[in-house]
Amino acid sequence: MRFNAFCDASFDRRTKLSGLAYHICGRVPSDVQEKSPVSMAGCLDGNHAEFVAVYWLLSEIVDYVGESAALCDVVIKTDSDHVERIWQGVVQERDVRKEELALLTACRQFCERFSSVNLEVVKGHVGWRQPEQTSCDK
């Protein structure tokens, strides 16, 4: 089983509030704020919010597939090159904020459950499209 999934986050510097959303192809888009106990006021900035979105996306897929996760390949698409640099190890762990390092560790634990997990950065992001317009493998 293969999952193509998209996630994005926004962060308001003035109010310090974040909006996080993700979409798993073939499922209805989810609003993380309604589904998670995480305080969205706790994000440090937009980069941290993007990492939280990746974490919640992985947790949602794990909840959805349960024990079948070992048979699943996951492709996560985000517009955050900051998350990609940390994910790929381009940034040394000593240079990563402790909050992001904790998220990376949690994401790696989720990744161990799947057959494979790949993170792709999609630049030129222009916001969410309707699910029927989103390119997904069937």
Residue spans for each PLM region:
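RNase H-like nuclease fold core
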Residues: 1-52, 59-63
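RNase H catalytic domain
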Residues: 11-14, 55-137
